[in-house]
Amino acid sequence: MFKSVKSEWELAMFNSIWVSVWEEKGYELEYTNQVVERFLAVSDDGEYVGTSEIKPYLLGHNEIESVAPFRHHPKIIDDPARVAEIDKIAILQHFRGQQPISDLLSSAVYCAEKYNFRYFISLLEPVFYRALRITFHIPMEKVGGKQFYKGDDVIPVLFDMEHIYRNKKQYDWLTYQNSSDNRAMPAL
């Protein structure tokens, strides 16, 4: 399941999870003030086990531009207002597996559909990139080559979120089919 971060306590849990994972992996910490929405992956036992953060994309102003020239990509130039950045995809070590990833990916699709985003941009670890491509069949394209950034090698990618939310039946990992029928947890 997934849920949107709504309270200060949930924000504290969100920060605790991604900071713990970043420190485990040796990444530099970077906090974000401006977000569209933050999500928590929730285990079947009700534990918060993962995070994802959707940030607005401001053509040429996101730090991600220092790694790859997203602003020059034709799909982004076409309609930058329908682009967002997904960041802080993190799962606590002892919960890593397909379900939390499915839940976080589902939260991303849910958010993209809710806000009418067409594309998400991101920097992915090469192993995670491969898993998304092979296991989850995420429609995405590389926007640049692999390079070192803030503690690890990353691959800059563009996700076709609109393709996923317009073709939900093609993605068996998706944990919701429409905005009113999902594995999203209601606010407590």
Residue map of PLM features:
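Short amphipathic alpha-helix that is part of the acyltransferase structural core
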Residues: 1-51
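Short acidic (Asp/Glu) patches
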Residues: 24-25, 35, 64-74
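Short, well-ordered beta-strand micro-motif
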Residues: 40-42, 53, 156-160
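Conserved beta-strand in the GNAT
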Residues: 47-56, 60, 85
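Feature marks short, surface-exposed loop/turn motifs that line or immediately flank catalytic pockets
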Residues: 56-58, 128, 163-165
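A short, polar/proline- and glycine-enriched secondary-structure boundary/capping micro-motif
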Residues: 60-65, 97
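Acyl-donor binding region in acyl/amide transferases
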Residues: 69-154, 161
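Charge-rich, low-complexity intrinsically disordered segments
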Residues: 153-188
